[in-house]
């Protein structure tokens, strides 16, 4: 029996994001071959989104861009976008990511776990810096956003940006895996 190939397209060329989408889909569809590729997709929001709302919109914009740019003969089965952002909540500043998944005419949205941020990091973000650059400076690393991310640094490697995205993607897939029971909306 020939294995089914599931084509996925990720709205980024960042290997962390492509790997997260690939791992999540491989877990959800273990009998299938996952054919993943990435493409640059604009978020339409600031390079460092500073609100929950902007972060969510950035993920949605990226997934829609991927769907619009894909050629008929190379269309993917699923489109993924991950947008990392920060916000200041009642308990303090934190970083998180939104996940947008396009499948046929459906759009699924999810959000990752949050990581509390030190106030000094948040202040640098308010001043216009990106989280990856701030973390690189603080921890003397290079291009951490394409590795373990702030999550890896602040948890001493017990969690990573990729593991956080992978879990969020699996959870966001629930409506697409169970369309009959998710048919009703709020």
UniProtKB/Swiss-Prot annotation:
HAMAP family linked to this entry: Non_canon_purine_NTPase_YjjX (MF_00648)
Organism: Shewanella baltica (strain OS195)
Identification of the protein by name: Inosine/xanthosine triphosphatase
Co-factor binding details: Binds 1 divalent metal cation per subunit; can use either Mg(2+) or Mn(2+).
Binding site for Mg(2+): 75
Family to which this protein belongs: Belongs to the YjjX NTPase family.
Disulphide bond pairs: none
One term of GO molecular function: metal ion binding
Pfam families: NTPase_I-T
